[in-house]
Amino acid sequence: MRSLIDRLTAAHIGRTTNFYRDGAGAALRRERLAAYLEARSEAPLLLVGEAPGYRGARVSGIPFTSERQLTGSGPAEATATIVQRVLTELGLTDQVLLWNVVPTHPGTDRSNRAPTRAEVAAGRRFADELARGRRVLAVGRIAANALGAPYIRHPSHGGVAEFREGLLRFAPGGRSVRPFSV
């Protein structure tokens, strides 16, 4: 995994921000990502989203994870909160490796934007590498179209129930428990 992180750190993906290379805290984000990838090295499922959010992985270094989830302080991120909660409820946390088809952040430090086709194409190689030996599920249409993987509805904008149902449909060993409300 170290070579993947080294290549990711060196990557220039369109007009995205490579927060593993640039800015205060880049070394900490790389360290966190390395620890996360090691901890999930045997996860049979790869859940791939579109791109890091400005309040999520851009700050924490871990896909679908906010700084608040790691440290108890800092910004929370709605999608990260929902994804982590649903994975916990379904007993899938350790079974899933989270990633984004564009692993660097499109947008500014205060906003997100959709990645361009070129950015998706350039970032996909990292998802392809992590997909080896794993079942791949795509969160959202951009990831599904890029990877040709089964689509799961993104949990934002009222999609929590459909996101949850998609995980139960495709994930091995998921269990249905009482849903939470957002």
Annotate each PLM feature.
Residues M1-A146, P150-Y151, H157-G158:
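A polyanion-binding, active-site-adjacent surface
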